[in-house]
Structures are given as C-alpha cells and as structure tokens.
C-alpha cells in the first residue's frame, strides 16, 4: 500500500494541550501537511483528539501516537481516529487498528520487527529512532522490504537533513521536536511546518 496522503510528512505534536491543539493543527495543515499525530503521552489527549477530528478530519489524516494497548485502539476508533502510530511492534494493536479500517504505522528497527508488523497488517513502517541508525541503514533495510510499503524516518529529522532520508528510500518522515515543542508559539509551528514542506518538495524534485 502506498501512503495515502498527498504529503508524506507526519506532524507529531507531542505534549500539546486541548486549549492549543486546534491552532497548531490548523497551522501545519495551512502549511500543507495532511497527516497529524497526537501522542498519547500528551496532556488530556482524550479531549484533543476528538476536537481535532471534528475540526480537521475532512482535511487531514488525524491520528494518535505512542499507542501501546489494544484497548487504546478501541477508544481511538470511537473518537474517529484514522491513523495509529506506535513506538514498538504489538501485533494485536496492529490487527485491532486494521480491523477498524485505520492506517497503522508501527515503529521498528530490524527486518524481523518490520516483517512481524507487516504480517499483522501494518500498511506503513516507521524506523525509530532513525538518528541512531542513519540513512544508509534504512537504505539497506528497504532492500528487503516490499517495494509498496511506505517507510518513514522518525527521530532526528530536520529540514536540513530531510533530503538524506528521502534519498535513502524513505517515503517521508515523522516530525517531532524540530517541528513542535510543547508550549511553543503557533507562529513557530507555522514557520517550521513551512520549512519542512519546502525541504520535502526540494528533495523530491
């Protein structure tokens, strides 16, 4: 399965609160993003995610990250969540999410983990933490993976190095602290989002 959004960059808004969520999500969508992840270790995510789905679910793939348990998938499905991102391989989490029709992008680091995730039904993979492995590692791993599986670099990706990950065969990237840090201004989020979009478009020219 090819990645289903127009821009294969996932905005990871870790630590965002319900009061600021809509403004920051609006900023990244205005910049061109169409996939957003709210990690479940963010404050009051149970309020943020439904509000974001209601406001932007028709404009972007709205999802949750750091999903660790099948029962969390159940709760997220009831909220209308469309994307599940995990830091690890939990086959039941993957199967449960696929059963709800969600897109699942689990975190993996080895070929064994990658194929375990694919056997459970994952449609995409995130290599995490990418900065610990480097682009050449991902390039080698990609050589044994199905060609239609979108691989995302997550961890340490910046506008300045995004092209290296794309050149290594990544479809795109998950963007965390270089895009958004808890408490930063909406203007800063918009600025960084625009920088990432520009870097991606230049990388794929």
Curated annotation (Swiss-Prot):
2-dehydro-3-deoxy-6-phospho-D-galactonate binds at residues 14, 66, 126, 156, 176-177. Homotrimer. This is 2-dehydro-3-deoxy-6-phosphogalactonate aldolase. The gene is dgoA. Induction: Part of the dgoRKADT operon, which encodes proteins for the metabolism of D-galactonate. Negatively regulated by DgoR. Expression is induced in the presence of D-galactonate and galactose. One of its GO terms (biological process) is D-galactonate catabolic process. It comes from Escherichia coli (strain K12). GO terms for molecular function: 2-dehydro-3-deoxy-6-phosphogalactonate aldolase activity. Keywords: Carbohydrate metabolism, Lyase. Pathway: Carbohydrate acid metabolism; D-galactonate degradation; D-glyceraldehyde 3-phosphate and pyruvate from D-galactonate: step 3/3. The record marks 14 as: Orients the nucleophilic substrate.
